[in-house]
Amino acid sequence: MSTRTASAGDIKEGSYIMIDNMPCRVVEVEKSKTGKHGSAKARIVGIGVIDGVKRTIVVPTDAAVEVPVIEKFTAQVISISGDSVQLMDLRNYQTFEIPSSYIEDEAKGKLEPGVQVEVWDVAGYKKIMRTR
């Protein structure tokens, strides 16, 4: 799982963050200053890249948070069998399987053997994002 750290105060909408050990796309950030002796807090709302679940985290703005490193690459569909898709990575020609639940909705209808797809490798999870 490849991640790096960033300050919670530097997180912006549209960026990615790890919430509950799942990579999430940030959809809302609220920063609030607390009382006289308190520290500023950031409320970050994200939607899971892999599962689409909405998650929320509240942390001090100076706290370190994990940011996933997203690796994008092209793969070719070898076969489709029921609940999984077998792919070949076009960088090193290794084959691997992805469950059907890890396929973006817009790409589901377009998959057939021989089609090239864009795959995101995020924190150890692989997901088909679109066809090429």
Swiss-Prot record:
Q: Does the keyword Cytoplasm apply?
A: yes
Coiled-coil positions are: none
Q: Which residues carry this modification: Hypusine?
A: 36
Q: Where does the source fall among the domains of life?
A: Archaea
Provide any one GO MF term from the record.
Answer: ribosome binding
UniProt xrefs under SUPFAM superfamilies? Nucleic acid-binding proteins (SSF50249), Translation proteins SH3-like domain (SSF50104)
Its name, as the record gives it, is Translation initiation factor 5A
